[in-house]
Amino acid sequence: RTLAWCGAVVAVALLVVVLMGWRGAPPEDFAHPGGRWSWWGSVLAGLLAAYAVFQVSVPGRSLAWAWLPMPAAIAWFAGMGWGCLAQVRADGGAVALGLGSWHCALAITLVSAPMLLVMLLLVRHAGVVRPVPTTVLAMLSAAGLSSAAVSLVHGHESALLTLAWHGGVVLLLCAAAW
């Protein structure tokens, strides 16, 4: 099931790249402080959360699998936090959220919604076993991989804006699942 999920993620990412345009490789976000940590952390968090969700959703499997993506998720958010601190320092202590970019919100929505729907389809029967961990891990997987995919088509934003969008949505969805 994890391989099926990865195939669906690649298909969605390719479709979004075709529709929105490729930025080139590697993403310029890697040049910003914390950019590599954030990108690789999001990819690893997404993949590990996918594997974990398919483990915790099987009756008799340990709930400890739910902790598998946590180090990668911490690296992802730490990378964004590092970018925020570097940006505040570069701006002389000013905190600029840069809310003018609705293109960023559109890109996040166009990438994450199909990924989340596919993941929820893959675990639709598993919700009976452990509904909260299954939902939280499914959302973390979709959020992590969509964050990485968005960076392929959308330029660097304010690190604080990125943290607010991705971090806020992950926290909101996890709270809603609880």
Predicted regions located by residue number:
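Alpha-helical transmembrane segments of multipass membrane proteins
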Residues: 13, 46, 50, 79-80, ...
